[in-house]
Structure formats: C-alpha cells, structure tokens
C-alpha cells in the first residue's frame, strides 16, 4: 500500500504566512522561511506554497519567496496562486517548484491543464478545487473562493483528470479553518471515482480528523495548516498517531 502523505500548507499574503476561517478573517501565522524550515525538519512529506491573493489581484505568484523556500527545503514543493499560463508555470519551476497548482485559471481556460501537463508531465500538475455546498450541491468556486462557477465538484474533478491533471487538491470552503474535520462526504465522492490522487484540505482540527480523511474520505494525502502552524501538533505526532491506527505513513 502506498504511504499516506501529510502536507502542511503555507497560505502566503504580503510576505507572511496567514490563516483564516472559511477563506476570510486572515491572521498572521509566522515567517515563510521559518515555517518552511520547520516543516522540512519535521518530516513533512511535501510542502504547499499558495499565494492566496495572486489570482484575486490578477498577478503572478511571488517567485522571489518561492526561490527562498526552495533553497531551504528538500521535500517536494507545490506552488500555486496566479499560475495562469504555461509561461508562469515554467517560471515557478525555474524558481524551485516541483509541482504547480492551478485553480482559477483552470476553470476559465481548462486547456491550460493539458498544455502544462504536455510540457512538464502530469505528475507536475495539481488542480486545486475549492468547493462550497450551495442548496445541497457541491459547487466549485474560484478567485480565492469569491466566485461560484457552473461546475459541480465531481463533474469538474473528472474533467480535470481527463485533461491531464496528476493530482487534485480538494478544499472544503465550508470547513476551511474551522478545525471541525474534513468534509469526508465530498472527499469520498471524488476519491472513489477518479484514479488520480486526491489531497484532503479544509477543516483539520485534530489527529482523528486526519485519520478520518484517510478512512472515511479515502484521501491519498491530508493537507493541514492551523494545527501545524500554531504547534498544536507536530508532523511526527500526526504520523505516529496514524501509524498506531493502521495507516501506512513514512517515518
């Protein structure tokens, strides 16, 4: 069985790591480089760097910060925010990214997924899907969750897979920052019907939530921010807990 991955996420704005609730009310969560070094030493499996206001402000990701982070970590680095063209993806790779995460641009121009995958390989393309429950339906949102789209989550997940995405980063906007647990309903709906890895995101508040994301949600990886940024738990604690409960992890 493939090992399940634990992935901390650096939501970056104005040169700092931040964390909010339901994509709103951001608070400072520390220095980008200090957090990156910490997670590298903590045995995180990967690290995600998301410039959370880049797409909203129609600008490119802060590549200078990406370069600094890539020089400090020796684990796979995914970079997202403002990746709106093959050229911007290329720039991210030149600055040390191992994968790029596309979200808003993928919805407005789905062929971008295929173009990046054709040039750099599917393994380098993560499609981030931000979902919110609206009248009982899971609707995909873009622009840092500000704009609803015409897509339902499962439909969009299948489409991005067909277009060449190598992985899906699925974030529940309803659960984001609440620490109430992942939305395992939509997680399972997508994880069990696509054949590419799905990363659970949005809502991790304790180690049981990580476990349930794997067992109930069938996720391949669990992304978390608040519980790690504010040192509620360490990555090692999380992995030891999961291993004790029968989940295969790298230690």
Curated annotation (Swiss-Prot):
Top-tier EC class: lyase
- PANTHER family, per the entry: IMIDAZOLE GLYCEROL PHOSPHATE SYNTHASE HISHF, IMIDAZOLE GLYCEROL PHOSPHATE SYNTHASE SUBUNIT HISF/H IGP SYNTHASE SUBUNIT HISF/H
Q: Which CDD domains match?
A: HisF
Q: Which Pfam families match?
A: His_biosynth (PF00977)
Location comes to: Cytoplasm
| GO-annotated biological processes | L-histidine biosynthetic process
Q: What does this protein do?
A: IGPS catalyzes the conversion of PRFAR and glutamine to IGP, AICAR and glutamate. The HisF subunit catalyzes the cyclization activity that produces IGP and AICAR from PRFAR using the ammonia provided by the HisH subunit.
* GO CC annotations on file: cytoplasm
- UniProt protein name: Imidazole glycerol phosphate synthase subunit HisF
Q: List the InterPro entries.
A: Aldolase_TIM, His_biosynth, HisF, IGPS_HisA/HisF, RibuloseP-bd_barrel
Which branch of life, at top level?
Bacteria
| Catalytic reaction(s) noted | 5-[(5-phospho-1-deoxy-D-ribulos-1-ylimino)methylamino]-1-(5-phospho-beta-D-ribosyl)imidazole-4-carboxamide + L-glutamine = D-erythro-1-(imidazol-4-yl)glycerol 3-phosphate + 5-amino-1-(5-phospho-beta-D-ribosyl)imidazole-4-carboxamide + L-glutamate + H(+)
């Amino acid at each position: 069985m493939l090992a399940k991955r634990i992935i901390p996420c650096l939501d970056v704005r104005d040169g700092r790591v931040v964390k909010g609730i339901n994509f709103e009310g951001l608070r400072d969560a520390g220095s980008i480089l200090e957090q990156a070094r910490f997670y590298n030493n903590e045995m995180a499996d990967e690290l995600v760097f998301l410039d959370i206001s880049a797409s909203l402000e129609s600008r490119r990701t802060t590549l200078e910060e990406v370069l600094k982070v890539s020089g400090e970590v020796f684990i796979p680095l995914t970079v997202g925010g403002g990746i709106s063209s093959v050229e911007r993806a290329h720039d991210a790779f030149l600055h040390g990214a191992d994968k790029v995460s596309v979200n808003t641009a993928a919805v407005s121009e789905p062929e971008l997924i295929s173009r990046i995958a054709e040039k750099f390989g599917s393994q380098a393309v993560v499609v981030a899907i931000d979902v919110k429950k609206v009248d009982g339906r899971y609707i995909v949102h873009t622009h840092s969750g500000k704009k609803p789209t015409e897509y339902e989550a499962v439909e969009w997940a299948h489409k991005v897979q067909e277009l060449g995405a190598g992985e899906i980063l699925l974030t529940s906007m309803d659960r984001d920052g609440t620490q109430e647990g992942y939305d395992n309903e939509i997680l399972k709906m997508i994880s069990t019907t696509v054949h590419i890895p799905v990363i659970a995101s949005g809502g991790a508040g304790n180690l049981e939530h990580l476990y349930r994301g794997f067992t109930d949600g069938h996720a391949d990886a669990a992304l978390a921010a608040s519980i790690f940024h504010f040192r509620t738990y360490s990555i090692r604690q999380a992995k030891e807990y999961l291993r004790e409960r029968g989940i295969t992890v790298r230690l």
